[in-house]
């Protein structure tokens, strides 16, 4: 369709129709000091050759660091075939598959993704993705409130990722939903189940259950799930998809299983690239499918009896009345889902298990080595997956700076989110780390501790 700009006559007719004298009058409520015709902070334009050289020079400034940072974004090996296939034009440049007869490849891929995620989580249904793990948790909270009907309160343990909690509060704040936090046990790093008793006589739409939690610790998911169901609340799982290849899936937690399972899909073939783009996943039980946000791909047969795939449930504001929509999720993260589907297909169940097992083994080995250093001890005495919190006897921020100077990113400073966890690092070692990497971390930490004493 060609673009035809408005003529002066068009503009004059529209202004007369709305009773305005000029286009500027439409924006007169904007303070004059905020109006500008120039972008003063933007440099002048560059040619392709100039910008290529500039980016090359900037890239040379980047150093290589051995990273032991996790906290929600994880460094995993991604087979070269994943993005070689993902960036094919059929996937890379395609838009939302509204026209089913012309988009069978994309629709089948999304259907396979849903099947894999539902299987991985032990749930009945998966949608075609959400924006990221944090917004997926917020959507789960909204979904739980819609399903519960009588309560607009959500119980959220402090062991849930602090950024997830912040995003959830932001999204639900203007919908009259109250978020109530549950403290953690300082000895175990788990949800303090005994502290849940104070809420025994109160009504909540859902209890959020992280597995593993932000500290890397494994929660008592069976007891927490049963507690929620005994109180007529929904159990909402927040999980690391890599861990599901090794741990009990949410659908098998407790007597009845979790009702909803969400999480961040980045570990499934998405690279660490300045924080995104990632994608969120959501799975649930069949009885909740009508409350699920986003879109679902279904398998059907056409008039000739041939198998095909189509967009089935699309309870979003672009398709139905805004007041009836479950979410404003838009084109979402289809390309990221493409990469995740290819990643899971290439690795298969055995490959995913090996990634999880190797990551766990590496973190166990690293923690055992580091605990032998004077001034290092585990912050919590509980089982963990592939992250662990370590408490130092010296200022942890200075230690991290010394490690970085030696080419090692030593972890996340937990006191930034948990003021009571002074000088405590959250460290992670995935399958990408070798024995030599673990030894290097141990040695540079030993030197940093000695220099900081």
UniProtKB/Swiss-Prot annotation:
| InterPro entries per the UniProt record, alphabetical | GcvPA, GDC-P_N, GDC_P, PyrdxlP-dep_Trfase, PyrdxlP-dep_Trfase_major, PyrdxlP-dep_Trfase_small
Q: Name one GO biological process term.
A: nucleoside metabolic process
Pfam families xref list: GDC-P
- Kindly list the GO molecular function terms attached to this UniProt entry: glycine dehydrogenase (decarboxylating) activity
The keyword Protein biosynthesis appears for this protein: no
The reaction(s) catalysed by this protein are: N(6)-[(R)-lipoyl]-L-lysyl-[glycine-cleavage complex H protein] + glycine + H(+) = N(6)-[(R)-S(8)-aminomethyldihydrolipoyl]-L-lysyl-[glycine-cleavage complex H protein] + CO2
| Signal sequence segment | none
Q: Which UniProt keywords apply?
A: Oxidoreductase
> Per the record's keyword annotation, is Oxidoreductase included, yes or no?
yes
Task: Tell me the enzyme class.
Answer: oxidoreductase
Q: Cite the EC number.
A: 1.4.4.2
Q: Which NCBIfam families match?
A: PRK00451.1 (NF001696)
Q: How does it assemble?
A: The glycine cleavage system is composed of four proteins: P, T, L and H. In this organism, the P 'protein' is a heterodimer of two subunits.
PANTHER family in the cross-refs: GLYCINE CLEAVAGE SYSTEM P-PROTEIN (PTHR42806), GLYCINE DEHYDROGENASE (DECARBOXYLATING) (PTHR42806:SF1)
| Role noted for this protein | The glycine cleavage system catalyzes the degradation of glycine. The P protein binds the alpha-amino group of glycine through its pyridoxal phosphate cofactor; CO(2) is released and the remaining methylamine moiety is then transferred to the lipoamide cofactor of the H protein.
Tell me which family the UniProt entry assigns to this protein: Belongs to the GcvP family. N-terminal subunit subfamily.
Name of the protein in its database record: Probable glycine dehydrogenase (decarboxylating) subunit 1
- Give the species this sequence originates from: Nitrosomonas europaea (strain ATCC 19718 / CIP 103999 / KCTC 2705 / NBRC 14298)
Q: Which gene encodes it?
A: gcvPA
